[in-house]
């Protein structure tokens, strides 16, 4: 079938994480035999990275069309309603170009509530089935913002099917919107796979993610101080960039761990995979997650995980592949760090990687998505015939 996947964008050298979730699923679906076209428009203020008009990318059997005219911040000056109409117009413009180049889609597949909200205009105007997948962390909270509540109420009811990436998020959609959703987990990308552990002199911890408060990296210096491991025996690499970079570096320095905890900045997936295969333990200290792709990438390489109990983490971490600790509990995190350090040989890296591939490989996820798409198309075909 032909799938038009509505995405934030396609990962680029300057921003390797932008649109990476969507790209992974697009490549998995293409590998499974579908024609996949990623549709996106860019409203960010990135003049030096963007050319005006359409940009086309074809890679790994996935076609991508991006449209850039004007940063949304300027359109926002005219009010929220005008901004919304502008964004819907841009998406329709990209859709028409995609139809011109690749033919009519069998199904529309949108990621994140904000993009799904705009995808509704395509469904209504062009009479195409629409499947929405949700992995926005704003939904997975006890209380959500009024604007998010309104957007969700105005959007999900138009979906022919809704998917979430974790059972915890599935429960939230029912709680906040009364929506029954399928669960299809995130993908462990093909860049991440088991290799024989290339151990270096020091026991190496690793973490990846944006340097923002939600990711909980500020807990790490405190936890390592409490764990009190021999300083000449370990190191911690944190991969990622963000607004908390300087605060985190200051906390590392003031804890006396400048020579142990290293902020490596942004890396592409191949570089992250190499660093994972050189590491002994992955740490996810997040305060809020849905279903962490970073954890799946570590597991795919066979790296045992220490993770906070949030979102769908219990759906992928068990006693054979890691340890869990309560959110924001520095003492429990320190204890998990010590336990993992002292019991490093208790985890079978090859078995961890094999289990991850069996549950979260691109083929497994593409098969699950295809089943949902086929159900939607068959149901709509039956309605139209009757």
Residue ranges, per PLM feature:
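Nucleotide-activated donor-binding/catalytic signature segment of Leloir-type glycosyltransferases, i.e.
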Residues: 249-267
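Aromatic "clamp/platform" in nucleotide-sugar-dependent glycosyltransferases that forms part
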Residues: 287
